[in-house]
């Protein structure tokens, strides 16, 4: 592995640590959540469409997503390792026989449809994706429970300290009254 490939692998690993992309291929309907900056405000915008191509390799890998917006075809090219991509969700798997689906540009209506893939590979990928999502939800739920328990313990300790201080104050007042 030469130095360039090594640096690219390190950068890709750094980005993968922040967010993981599901395995998807041309023909799949994907929802790409992109960070959009408008003025001084940043928000996340969902862009849903059919992945019609994947090109490049390493850090320069791109994928093209096509959607029909108000009757007009719109294509957008996303770099896979872009920091502006927050997440990519696979909505449905498509069954195609080509790597580049540029022929969809000339088609409208039913002829532009892509049949859903219900094969073993698609099922396995969907199950793996669902398991990853469920695992992530369980992790988040566990963090919430741990935070709630820590808050309850902190509150109980504060109440105990408050009760102890009140008892000491009452004892001091009682000794002063004698």
UniProtKB/Swiss-Prot annotation:
The answer to keyword Ribonucleoprotein applying to this record is: yes
Pfam families according to UniProt: Ribosomal_L19
Gene Ontology terms for molecular function: structural constituent of ribosome
Among Gene3D superfamilies, the record links this protein to: 2.30.30.790
Q: Which Cys pairs does UniProt list as disulfide-bonded?
A: none
Any one annotated GO CC term: cytosolic large ribosomal subunit
Q: Which UniProt keywords apply?
A: Ribonucleoprotein, Ribosomal protein
The keyword Transferase belongs to this UniProt entry's keyword annotation: no
From which domain of life does this come?
Bacteria
Single biological process term from Gene Ontology: translation
**PROSITE patterns named among the record's database cross-references:** RIBOSOMAL_L19 (PS01015)
Question: Entry's InterPro entries?
Answer: Ribosomal_bL19, Ribosomal_bL19_CS, Ribosomal_bL19_sf, Translation_prot_SH3-like_sf
- Ranges annotated as spanning the membrane: none
Under the heading HAMAP family, the entry gives: Ribosomal_bL19
The similarity annotation says: Belongs to the bacterial ribosomal protein bL19 family.
- Which PANTHER family does the entry mention? LARGE RIBOSOMAL SUBUNIT PROTEIN BL19M, RIBOSOMAL PROTEIN L19
Would you tell me the protein name for this molecule? Large ribosomal subunit protein bL19
Q: Which organism is it from?
A: Rhizobium etli (strain CIAT 652)
The taxonomy runs: Bacteria, Pseudomonadati, Pseudomonadota, Alphaproteobacteria, Hyphomicrobiales
